[in-house]
Swiss-Prot record:
Organism (species): Homo sapiens (Human)
5-glutamyl polyglutamate sites (modified residues): 438
GO cellular component: cytoplasm; extracellular exosome; extracellular vesicle; intercellular bridge; microtubule; microtubule cytoskeleton; mitotic spindle; nucleus
Transmembrane intervals: none
Protein encoded by which gene: TUBB2A
SUPFAM superfamilies to which the protein is assigned, alphabetical: Tubulin C-terminal domain-like, Tubulin nucleotide-binding domain-like
Intracellular or extracellular location(s): Cytoplasm, Cytoskeleton
UniProt free text on domains: The MREI motif is common among all beta-tubulin isoforms and may be critical for tubulin autoregulation.
Record: residues binding GTP: 11, 69, 138, 142-144, 204, 226
Chain intervals with Acidic residues compositional bias: 429-445
Protein name per the record: Tubulin beta-2A chain
Residues annotated with N6-acetyllysine modification: 58
Keywords: Acetylation, Cytoplasm, Cytoskeleton, Disease variant, GTP-binding, Isopeptide bond, Magnesium, Metal-binding, Methylation, Microtubule, Nucleotide-binding, Phosphoprotein, Ubl conjugation
């Protein structure tokens, strides 16, 4: 079967990753000891996409946990599903990267990377037909961003024809942990543009807004944010884990979603997002899911899709529902909002349907959009980067680890190129008649 090797790097990556394993273990009926207690054969049918079967019918996540300090991994180990992971797959250093990309990428991380690659090889060799890798990390810190991107490029060298998929938490202005986030993020994006096939851009600011506005949580914790991320990750990977009427794997997804190799940064979304209290007051229908899923308030990246146009979209519906209705609704969205989809890619919305809904819901939908509006996110990081870099603020932390200023300049211009590529395709029309229609569409919106 088509296996995926999961890697989580750094504090953020490990926390999101741990939550992801809790959610999908629950969906597959696997308890914290790795034993199966499910009630449906469908749960086991494609279990080996994410799990290895060990002696005594134990299922072990095909996960590799990486960090440059032991702290976060200790808390994962003592967390609810800590005992399910294979002990050899915890790879950690002692020194920490101190939110410094250079330490993660060139010094501390580079020392640890070989032992991580050994574990990656071990996991890949036990696969029947390896489909690809997924990495969870953040771009603002040191380990997830610096060492995460180092791992990506090393894995890319060794497995050039496998899909590389990342869930990357972008730094956001409202939720900032460190001053040097713009540096770390820009240096990381420089790597991601070249070395990944699909990157889901997740943004703490957007997650906060969802928790606050939609879920009515007055003081959202990181646990709440990570819960949203794991719901999305679970949705994105549904097709790979359960049989469905229209299945996708990582490669099919990439083929459908990436029109130009550099433009592979997706905005994920999820529906239904309802606060815990008001769940039973809403009937979930396919039209409602579709409408909610395309709503900018449901996007996990702090960009407004109405400010750009969709190059491609993938929607994954879960639950028992009529295929005909799903198709009608998706067409309906495209027809009503045609100005927001580029007209030079016909049929640019793909739908997949899986029969098994997530726990506690009758049906749900996960949205993956490749929208030119994502440039807002890169512009934001780029502005912050430029402000600091112009004064060479904090640069000594990076040059002290052996980095060169040239590398910063290159990363900056690569990011700006990315922004202008998105802009160029946003403005492109199949013929010049398109501009008039676009203005009309804006009046309605």
């Amino acid at each position: 079967m088509r296996e995926i090797v999961h890697i989580q790097a750094g504090q953020c990556g490990n926390q999101i990753g741990a939550k992801f394993w809790e959610v999908i273990s629950d969906e597959h009926g696997i308890d914290p000891t790795g034993s199966y207690h499910g009630d449906s054969d469908l749960q086991l049918e494609r279990i080996n996409v994410y799990y290895n079967e060990a002696a005594g019918n134990k299922y072990v996540p095909r996960a590799i946990l990486v960090d440059l300090e032991p702290g976060t991994m200790d808390s994962v180990r003592s967390g609810p599903f800590g005992q399910i992971f294979r002990p050899d797959n915890f790879v950690f250093g002692q020194s920490g990267a101190g939110n410094n990309w250079a330490k993660g990428h060139y010094t501390e991380g580079a020392e640890l990377v070989d032992s991580v690659l050994d574990v990656v090889r071990k996991e890949s060799e036990s696969c029947d037909c390896l489909q690809g890798f997924q990495l969870t990390h953040s771009l603002g810190g040191g380990t997830g961003s610096g060492m995460g991107t180092l791992l990506i490029s090393k894995i890319r060298e060794e497995y050039p024809d496998r899909i590389m998929n990342t869930f990357s938490v972008m730094p956001s202005p409202k939720v900032s942990d460190t001053v040097v986030e713009p540096y770390n993020a820009t240096l990381s994006v420089h790597q991601l543009v070249e070395n990944t096939d699909e990157t889901y851009s997740i943004d703490n600011e957007a997650l906060y807004d969802i928790c606050f506005r939609t879920l009515k949580l007055t003081t959202p914790t990181y646990g709440d944010l990570n819960h949203l991320v794991s719901a999305t990750m679970s949705g994105v990977t549904t097709c790979l884990r359960f049989p469905g009427q229209l299945n996708a794997d990582l490669r099919k997804l990439a083929v459908n979603m990436v029109p130009f190799p550099r433009l592979h940064f997706f905005m994920p979304g999820f529906a239904p997002l309802t606060s815990r209290g008001s769940q039973q007051y809403r009937a979930l229908t396919v039209p409602e899911l579709t409408q909610q899923m395309f709503d900018s308030k449901n996007m996990m990246a702090a960009c407004d899709p109405r400010h750009g146009r969709y190059l491609t979209v993938a929607a994954i519906f879960r639950g028992r529902m009529s295929m005909k209705e799903v198709d009608e609704q998706m067409l309906n969205v495209q027809n009503k909002n045609s100005s927001y989809f580029v007209e030079w890619i016909p049929n640019n919305v793909k739908t997949a349907v899986c029969d098994i809904p997530p726990r506690g819901l009758k049906m749900s939908a996960t949205f993956i959009g490749n929208s030119t509006a994502i440039q807002e996110l890169f512009k934001r990081i780029s502005e912050q980067f430029t402000a600091m870099f112009r004064r060479k603020a904090f640069l000594h932390w990076y040059t002290g680890e052996g980095m060169d200023e040239m590398e910063f300049t290159e990363a900056e211009s690569n990011m700006n190129d990315l922004v202008s590529e998105y802009q160029q395709y946003q403005d492109a029309t199949a013929d010049e008649q398109g501009e008039f229609e676009e203005e009309e569409g804006e009046d309605e919106a």
